[in-house]
Each structure stands twice: as structure tokens, then as C-alpha cells.
């Protein structure tokens, strides 16, 4: 079992993207992939994604980016979020209440209004 009681999820099973979903999961994202749908259904990440996407929607620079890296880092008492442009330039960063992530660092990519796991690109 991963450190800190993290729930083990097999996210590596999602490669390529065979099916996309218009989100009906209560988050402000237009399209998600199978891997992200699985992640949302099997973890408590939904509320964190709502906060992250509120930040993106409030920032015109991030809205204009065609590619964003959303990095969630598990810390002892919180999650730390970094939103980058894909070239290690941090566009925003902030702490969130602790949730259990499937691993100590979870990266998600937001590409042309679609949220996906890096392995699904």
C-alpha cells in the first residue's frame, strides 16, 4: 500500500483516449477522459478539481493556454497545487485541504478544454 494510507489505483491502465465524456460529475470542466472519470469516481478529488478550475477560469492567461499541467502534491496536512504551462513556468499555486491522492504527486494535463492523465495523451 502506498505511504500515508493512499488508495492504490491502477492509473497506468489508461493509455490513449478511446472515449471522452462531457462531464456530468458536478465539476466545471467541459470534457474528461476515461482515466480522469475513473479517478473522480474512485477518489475524493472532485472538490479539489472544482477549486482548481475556478482558478483557471479566473485567470485569462491560463484560459488562453492550450496546454496546462496541473500538479497535485501530497503534503502531511494538505495538498499543494501548481498549475504550469508545460515549460515549468508556474502560472498559479495554492494549498488545498488534504485529500487522499493515489500517489504522492499526481499530474493531470488540461489540453484544449479536455482534462486527461498524461498517459492518455
Predicted regions mapped to residue ranges:
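N-terminal "domain-start" segment
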Residues: 2-92
Amino acid at each position: 500500500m502506498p505511504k500515508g494510507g493512499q488508495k492504490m489505483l491502477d492509473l497506468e491502465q489508461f493509455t490513449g483516449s478511446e472515449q471522452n465524456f462531457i462531464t456530468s460529475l458536478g465539476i466545471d470542466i467541459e470534457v474528461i477522459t476515461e482515466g480522469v472519470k475513473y479517478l473522480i469516481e474512485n477518489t475524493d478529488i472532485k472538490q479539489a478539481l472544482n477549486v482548481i478550475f475556478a482558478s483557471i477560469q479566473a485567470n485569462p492567461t491560463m484560459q488562453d493556454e492550450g496546454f496546462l499541467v496541473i500538479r497535485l502534491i501530497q503534503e502531511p496536512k494538505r495538498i499543494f497545487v501548481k498549475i504550469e504551462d508545460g515549460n515549468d513556468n508556474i502560472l498559479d499555486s495554492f494549498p488545498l485541504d488534504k485529500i487522499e491522492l493515489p500517489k504522492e504527486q499526481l499530474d493531470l494535463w488540461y489540453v484544449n478544454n479536455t482534462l486527461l492523465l498524461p498517459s492518455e495523451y
